[in-house]
Amino acid sequence: MKKILSALLLIFAMLLSACGGVKYELKDGLMYDADGKEATGTFEFKTGKYKVKGNFVNGLPDGLFEEYYEDGSIMAKETFVNGEMTSKELFYKNGNLLGNFTENDDIKLYYDDGSLILSYDAEKEESTYYHENGNPLMIGNSYETTLYNENNEVISKLRDDDLTDIGATLKKLDDGTFELVKGNEVIAKIDANDEIINYLYSTGEPLLKVNESTGETEFFFKNGNTFMKGKEGGSILNYRDGKPLYEIDGDSETIYNEEGDKIVGGFDLVTDIKKLD
């Protein structure tokens, strides 16, 4: 009887081992073992539907963490030092860089072909958005914002929230609307009520629509799709086909790849924790 009981206990122990044995919990960014102690080692787990692998030291993330798309390609690489994230890189499924975030809060976002979408210099507190051809579209900081057409020509400049002289002339048309002309080029059209201004590409397509009465702004690609649009409490930046890329909603930020997959990052909705060593 004792031999049978011992054999059953051995089988039960083997089953426990096969089922994972020690259970771990990731809570508030810290990894704990079954006894509630801060764990050390390399772990693999899921955040939503994506797999993550990385190292913890005394419960804190430390070193390189990699997050994977469902097909196994790299989605994100995050580097931690003693629990603090020092850098983050995001990737398209083909391996090209989507975004780069540094410890000092510098940001760069890229199209799939490697061209820049936007960059943020934290030291200067300056944001730069780019045309599809790589020229700057808008450069803005705490005191000045400059708008450019695709040929790198200034078509609007604000300094301390006031429009500055860029050498353009306002021309009133027979229908009561206005055109803003710089040289021989129409750079903007304004409605008769002086409420809506449409800045233009050099070839005449809408570039930026500003509604003075509502405060709404909307930037456009040359193909007519929305590039960027402000909304209450935030803004949304799109790919060339109009699908969302980067969305800000209050204090929340979301980044999507070109297929619409949400780039998760961080340690939210963690399941299936496994210790690898």
Give, region by region, the residue ranges found by the protein language model.
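Composition-driven detection of intrinsically disordered, low-complexity segments
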Residues: A7-L8, G234
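Positively charged n-region of N-terminal signal peptides that target proteins for export
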Residues: M1-I4
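Bacterial N-terminal signal peptides
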Residues: L8-L15
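Glycine/tyrosine- and acidic-biased, solvent-exposed loop/turn segments at the edges of beta-strands
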Residues: S17-D277
